[in-house]
Amino acid sequence: MIAQELEVSLHMAFVEARQARHEFITVEHLLLALLDNPSAAEVLRACAVNVDDLRKTLTNFITDNTPTVPGTSEVDTQPTLGFQRVIQRAIMHVQSASNGKKEVTGANVLVAIFGEKDSHAVYYLHQQGVTRLDVVNFISHGVRKDQQSESQKAPDGVEESTAEGQQKESALDQF
């Protein structure tokens, strides 16, 4: 049900949170782990994300805002409700999709993160210019963000013909 690559990413997120003695593992921890997930990283690159900048921003946010557990005993890091909802949302989406896919990948979790509208993870993705639509377009249709902007531009011939048309008299003036 969960792809091996996603299991590794989730495990690494928990290990890093535990080593940093964080009391909670958050959606931001999850997004940080997805930066190293092959399927999620491919989607982020296709959406023109500066991965290094996003990694630095997330690391700083997590360091500054995640409560830590004092002492030297082993830490029992707990997932936040937002973290749990993201994973559940990704699983439910894959189960309900009728495209024959059975495994949840990092790309599916990336889409599910956008459901947590009030999270800093979504805010940082929006800062990078990424929307849920960009991610879904790439996953579903292979449309890269840079291809979207090129296809929205008018063809060269259209611009020239309109410029020539403005120099000619309008149909009403010709009448």
Can you say where each PLM-predicted feature lies in the sequence?
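Histone-fold recognition with a strong bias for associated Lys/Arg-rich disordered tails
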Residues: 1-175
